From Swiss-Prot:
Protein name: Uncharacterized fimbrial-like protein YfcV
Coiled-coil segments: none
Family listed: Belongs to the fimbrial protein family.
Any further remark recorded for this protein: The operon is cryptic under classical laboratory conditions, but is functional when constitutively expressed.
Signal sequence extent: 1-25
GO BP: any one term: cell adhesion
Function: Part of the yfcOPQRSUV fimbrial operon. Could contribute to adhesion to various surfaces in specific environmental niches. Increases adhesion to eukaryotic T24 bladder epithelial cells in the absence of fim genes.
Length: 187
């Protein structure tokens, strides 16, 4: 191989190294936002659970006529990093807009397109057995204890049910949502 060819190959290799380094060095930039809340509490809510979304599914209007109800949908609030001392009970209190569509323990559901309240249907939230609770009324659940220490375990799960409740007449049709807040206290 001639000296010229060897020099050309070496030069090409060096240029290729610089080119690939330049290509590797190029990239993307962005930002990361880390957020949360430090609260005076014995537990932390699992990050995915502090903003719950419960998919109630596609519901046939016929099921809700004549005071019908849907099959309850289970949902949970998971707790972690709990440090219990003498606490025995966790009380979860849901609050939201109370429905005028049905008398009872129910929350208003709103049309996601118009923002208007649905007629003849509302949302019930209840304990794991399916007993509905009024807005602002606490749902008690026992703290699961560690048998070795007789103190609450570091991880706890609060179990609930949600379902729709119809009225005598047919409900409005369309996409809906109901928004509530919840607070957990430890006694």
């Amino acid at each position: 191989m001639s000296k010229f060819v060897k020099t050309a190959i070496a030069a090409a290799m060096v240029m290729g190294a610089f080119t690939s380094t330049a290509t590797i060095a190029a990239g993307n930039n962005g930002t990361a936002r880390f957020y949360g809340t430090i609260e005076d509490s014995v537990c932390s809510i699992v990050p995915d659970d502090h903003k719950l979304e419960v998919d109630m599914g596609d519901i046939g209007a016929e099921k809700l006529k004549n005071n019908g109800t849907t099959t309850p949908k289970n949902f949970q609030i998971r707790l972690q990093d709990c440090v219990f001392d003498t606490q025995e009970t966790m009380t979860t209190t849901f609050t939201g807009t109370v429905s005028s569509a049905n008398s009872g323990n129910y929350y208003t559901i709103f049309n996601t397109d118009t923002g208007a309240a649905f007629n003849n249907v509302s949302l019930a939230i209840g304990d794991s057995l399916g007993t509905s609770y009024k807005s602002g009324m606490g749902i008690d659940q026992k703290i699961v204890k560690d048998t070795a220490t007789n103190k609450g375990k570091a991880k706890q799960t609060l179990n609930f049910k949600a379902w729709l409740v119809g009225a005598a007449d047919a409900p409005d049709l369309g996409n809906f949502e109901a928004n509530t807040t919840f607070q957990i206290t430890y006694l």
